[in-house]
Amino acid sequence: MYEDSYVPGFEDSEAGSADSYTSRPSLDSDVSLEEDRESARREVESQAQQQLERAKHKPVAFAVRTNVSYCGVLDEECPVQGSGINFEAKDFLHIKEKYSNDWWIGRLVKEGGDIAFIPSPQRLESIRLKQEQKARRSGNPSSLSDIGNRRSPPPSLAKQKQKQAEHVPPYDVVPSMRPVVLVGPSLKGYEVTDMMQKALFDFLKHRFDGRISITRVTADLSLAKRSVLNNPGKRTIIERSSARSSIAEVQSEIERIFELAKSLQLVVLDADTINHPAQLAKTSLAPIIVFVKVSSPKVLQRLIRSRGKSQMKHLTVQMMAYDKLVQCPPESFDVILDENQLEDACEHLAEYLEVYWRATHHPAPGPGLLGPPSAIPGLQSQQLLGERGEEHSPLERDSLMPSDEAWTGSSQRSSRHLEEDYADAYQDLYQPHRQHTSGLPSANGHDPQDRLLAQDSEHNHNDRNWQRNRPWPKDSY
């Protein structure tokens, strides 16, 4: 009776049940593949984490200054989740090594900055293109038509802005240690400016002994603009018009500064031709600009007049240079030394450089970090100055600032004669330090009586000698 009866849906249910049985192996294989992929992902992330840890003990390969902002927390493609770097435009990064085409390993140059994954220029360019495509897809046609109706800027200006926007790279390669450059209170080559800056050079040489390289640069570094060095046509034009420095000489000096910075020592430039921050703004040096500021023009005039008629003849030029520096916005400088006393100005600069030193040196223990460059693993083959032992190479001896003894010797006076003649010949002691020849002894050969950081038993004695021989103006300004 029921054999020929039809039960609706029975065949379908049977078929569905059969299909479910046959589809189970496929589901199991999908789960297995997903587990394999997850296992492989965890293995890759573990290896990336290990490489990140090993990079902490590696030397800095090079440094960059950022032109864009980036948030690593939002990047899901970071090799180790949560280990992506965050930075803003104009930050500085130390690059340790290349992880892949899309990622570097390095750290943000700041106190306590940890090792992290850094997007390579290729990855940042890829992110930028994706953002542009997304913006085009979400663009409103009506708004695009409105732009045509608005008053547009001149074509030349619009093209110039578009060209600048297109050619700005995400990173600029800069020295591993930003070189320190002093400007002010007026023009270099004149006695007041030279004697005030020399007092700071002498202080830094003693205060950061073993951690600093002070080198003189006579080439015109303002010619080292990236657009000039990368454009053969512009190089030829400037080569013909420049009597002071050739482009080849400038390029050589830039390379030498980069090599000095590889040691991760502080680098201070005694740059003869740099008197304004704008001169170095478009170079790849990314310097720390220190403004030695006299707060009152009347005080500067009095100081110039006190140096005699030879300096009075150039009073107008020096005051014009002073005015240009004072008119600069404060953000043009990294440090402004406007203290009334030499000791206060020195301590201000020293505090800034100590913070910068800690920012550039990773807190993790590294072998030879505070020692000479030759003691840092992996850097010996990179040194411009060659193999270094107890003594400096001839090139380094030529580049370092002369010691106090050499400066005194070049002025044909011994320290004993200086002390005897000091009472009535203060103004005659000064010899512009920019007239020195390069064949001077190493700056590391200090006489004990000239040290600022001597033992406690000799501290007061040395402090008195330094106060007596300092070339800083006696005026309180």
UniProtKB/Swiss-Prot annotation:
Residues 387-399, 456-477 have a biased composition (Basic and acidic residues). One of its GO terms (molecular function) is voltage-gated calcium channel activity. Its main location: cytoplasm. InterPro entries: CAB1-4_N_A-dom, CACNB3_SH3, GK/Ca_channel_bsu, P-loop_NTPase, SH3-like_dom_sf, SH3_domain, VDCC_L_b3su, VDCC_L_bsu. One of its GO terms (biological process) is calcium ion transmembrane transport via high voltage-gated calcium channel. Residues 59-128 form the SH3 domain. Belongs to the calcium channel beta subunit family. Residues 195-345 are annotated as: Mediates interaction with the alpha subunit. Regulatory subunit of the voltage-gated calcium channel that gives rise to L-type calcium currents. Increases CACNA1B peak calcium current and shifts the voltage dependencies of channel activation and inactivation. Increases CACNA1C peak calcium current and shifts the voltage dependencies of channel activation and inactivation. Residues 1-52, 129-170, 385-477 are annotated as: Disordered. Keywords: Calcium, Calcium channel, Calcium transport, Cytoplasm, Ion channel, Ion transport, Phosphoprotein, SH3 domain, Transport, Voltage-gated channel. Transmembrane segments: none annotated. It is found in: Cytoplasm. Most abundant in brain but also present in aorta, trachea and lung. The modification Phosphoserine is found at S152, S393. It comes from Oryctolagus cuniculus. This is Voltage-dependent L-type calcium channel subunit beta-3. One of its GO terms (cellular component) is cytoplasm. Gene3D superfamilies: P-loop containing nucleotide triphosphate hydrolases, SH3 Domains. The gene is CACNB3. It comes from the Eukaryota. Component of a calcium channel complex consisting of a pore-forming alpha subunit (CACNA1C) and the ancillary subunits CACNB3 and CACNA2D1. The channel complex contains alpha, beta, gamma and delta subunits in a 1:1:1:1 ratio. Interacts with CACNA2D4. Interacts with FASLG. Interacts with CBARP; prevents the interaction of CACNB3 with the alpha subunit CACNA1C thereby negatively regulating the activity of the corresponding calcium channel.
